[in-house]
């Protein structure tokens, strides 16, 4: 008999097994978390980029009080001394202790040192001891504080009928500038444009740079080939090492050396190479005013990593357009500064756009090439007014300040105001200009005015802290053409950084957001390809 087959029992048989899912379904399910992760990364990236560009409030730079004179003679109508070319330095041990040196051109060649013990609120003049056996013609001073708070003052003594440098001297002060030691002779004759720089870490190390002339005529060098040199002291200015050449042989008309020392001990010297400019260098203008040299000049940075023994050079810019004629013995210096990270800034004026503007170049740490020039002054391009003679200072927090002469308020382009602008992003952008001077100065008052070459000095001066900056300049408001009186004036600004993220954090968010965005897009593309394959 055959077996009888009945209907299956209902409710007792298990459903078909689903332990094994098809590969297609696995791919579809796997693409979903990939897509979710990709979208998440893209959203995070967008947020990071938005946050990196955000700031709770913008930076502010505002004038504090009003400008005031620095030199004692400014308060006397009987003293018509022409103070100019200030160097302002701050004591790193006692920050309220400031010192400023100044050159005096008329009525007699001389120099001065003023010190402050209250952050620049008040000033007193310190007597400069005369070297024995020298003519009493102190001139062209410079000043620097060592890391231990010792103040060092350099100056030249003039000699002969031509009043040319006869010797270079250094005096020191261990009492915050109240008194100076007997001067020590450092260099001999024809040392021009002497500058001092102190190592910010090594307390006893000083550098001196200068232009060493072979021969001179009246307010001129007789030919090219006068090098920029350097010497070093490792004992606080008591003794000095053998000189070394800074400027390369290719730069035959190098002038106006400006030294600065970085935190790592690297020595930088920024100088001008005036190219084929015989008009100014060899006195072709015979001390008379007129159109400037028509050819280009160059800005050159020399760098030494072995305390001045050997040097390398880079050309910052070789297309500078001169703004005016000048006396080569007393040129206008370019300005150089270096921040704690080793970023180098250089600044000078150039008439590339038809009238003088302040330009800034920067060299990032480890970089081999300079940034493109950045126009600092916020005037309308080609407005017919001059902005010139910039001075740079870097605050401890990395903010960059630029001080300069500014004629934007004078359509005739003759009267100087003094402006300050700040950058919180390494020179990429600047705050609007703040006017420090309460009254304009006549740029036609100064030594050489009768010949059409008035001299307001070789530089401005400034020190910067995280919350403030103090600027000094040559002011002629008390002078008239008959007296040529010039004074030093000062003014301070208060600075508030933009509230928000530091530049380092902003960069990290910016680059990190970019990378996360790319990763998120890649994951989204992967998820899309998986679904299309199904």
Predicted regions and their residues:
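Terminal targeting segments of Actinobacterial cell-envelope proteins
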Residues: 1-29, 532-534
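Extracellular, repeat-based ectodomains that mediate carbohydrate processing or recognition
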Residues: 29-38, 43-534
